[in-house]
């Protein structure tokens, strides 16, 4: 089987992505019923490169490999020659001789692409400044579990046109739903990514207008990692874009609220929104584990029924 990478949602076909979502749900249900008895990754090793720290990403990938009988290696810039200037391609070629699959959480998407181009083993994007596709697998899985098929439905992104927003746009293309992106002027997502999605994506600047009749509402922090010095300015610019219980009241009666976490209560969301019955953020966070199990299984073993 040819080496497949998962750098954005566009690296898999819509049919493959739909299979992954259903497979993740099956894996989750099997774990609840039988415990971690399915171990297809025996003697397999995942190398995890972290330039950006994370709670959910590290724990979910390490646990996924442990449940499936494999092993995960944590590598920070201090642990590798990349931190001392070794070319990215050289590191990729070396690691491919030793491990079965690689996960990278970094700043530069171009650097990730350079690594994948030189790698003979699958590479997973666990977050770059441009995309966060693993989170979208968990998000669509959660939406599907809670509300059924997402095809033809309407999701709303409120906030910065950042890496999460870009992946939501790609998800609208691949899973065939409509997406309204609502942000302050000047914080729109990449124009080329929006254009590629065609009529599925609409840019708005009024949160109340954006959520009218929406099936799902989601958001993210106003200042991402590396943007801390912009926090004060962003708080001013995003005033009026906080997602609250009252804002959700203008969406569909059965609206679902998601947040990739960590959340800054009192900033992009009200202090109590995560506890609202319309929010499914804890289920969403837990689904990172199951969605990534399905992803690693697909990249190493192909389609498993």
Swiss-Prot record:
It catalyses: carbamoyl phosphate + L-ornithine = L-citrulline + phosphate + H(+). It is an enzyme of class 2 (transferase). PROSITE patterns: CARBAMOYLTRANSFERASE. Disulfide bonds: none annotated. Pfam families: OTCace, OTCace_N. L-ornithine binds at residues 163, 220, 224-225. Pathway: Amino-acid biosynthesis; L-arginine biosynthesis; L-arginine from L-ornithine and carbamoyl phosphate: step 1/3. Its main location: cytoplasm. The keyword Membrane does not apply. One of its GO terms (molecular function) is ornithine carbamoyltransferase activity. Its EC number is 2.1.3.3. It is found in: Cytoplasm. GO terms for cellular component: cytoplasm. Carbamoyl phosphate binds at residues 54-57, 81, 105, 132-135, 260-261, 288. Keywords: Amino-acid biosynthesis, Arginine biosynthesis, Cytoplasm, Transferase. GO terms for biological process: arginine biosynthetic process via ornithine; citrulline biosynthetic process; L-arginine biosynthetic process. Reversibly catalyzes the transfer of the carbamoyl group from carbamoyl phosphate (CP) to the N(epsilon) atom of ornithine (ORN) to produce L-citrulline. Belongs to the aspartate/ornithine carbamoyltransferase superfamily. OTCase family. HAMAP family: OTCase. This is Ornithine carbamoyltransferase. It comes from Chromohalobacter salexigens (strain ATCC BAA-138 / DSM 3043 / CIP 106854 / NCIMB 13768 / 1H11).
């Amino acid at each position: 089987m040819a080496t497949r990478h998962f750098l954005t949602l566009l690296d898999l076909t819509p049919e493959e992505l739909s299979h992954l979502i259903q497979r993740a749900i099956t894996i989750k249900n099997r774990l609840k019923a039988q415990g971690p008895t399915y171990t297809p990754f025996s003697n397999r090793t995942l190398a995890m490169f972290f330039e950006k720290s994370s709670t959910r990403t590290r724990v979910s990938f390490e646990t996924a490999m442990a449940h499936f009988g494999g092993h995960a290696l944590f590598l920070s810039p201090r642990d590798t020659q990349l931190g001392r200037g070794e070319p990215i391609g050289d590191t990729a070629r070396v690691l491919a001789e030793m491990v079965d699959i690689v996960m990278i959480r970094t700043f530069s998407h171009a650097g990730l692409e350079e690594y994948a181009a030189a790698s003979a083993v699958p590479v997973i994007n666990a977050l770059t400044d441009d995309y966060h596709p693993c989170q979208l697998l968990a998000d669509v899985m959660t939406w599907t579990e809670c509300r059924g098929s997402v095809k033809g439905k309407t999701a709303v992104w409120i906030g910065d046109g950042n890496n999460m927003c870009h992946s939501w746009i790609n998800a609208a293309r691949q899973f065939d739903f409509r997406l309204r992106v609502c942000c302050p002027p000047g914080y729109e997502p990449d124009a080329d990514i929006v254009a590629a999605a065609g009529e599925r994506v609409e840019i708005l600047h009024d949160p109340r207008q954006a959520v009218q009749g929406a099936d799902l509402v989601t958001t993210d922090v106003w200042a991402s990692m590396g943007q801390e010095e912009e926090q004060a300015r962003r708080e001013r610019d995003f005033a009026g874009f906080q997602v609250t219980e009252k804002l959700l009241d203008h969406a569909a009666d059965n609206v679902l609220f998601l947040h990739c976490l960590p959340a800054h209560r009192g900033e992009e969301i009200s202090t109590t929104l995560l506890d609202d019955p319309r929010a499914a953020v804890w289920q969403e966070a837990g689904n990172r584990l199951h969605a990534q199990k399905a992803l690693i299984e697909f990249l190493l073993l192909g389609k498993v029924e």
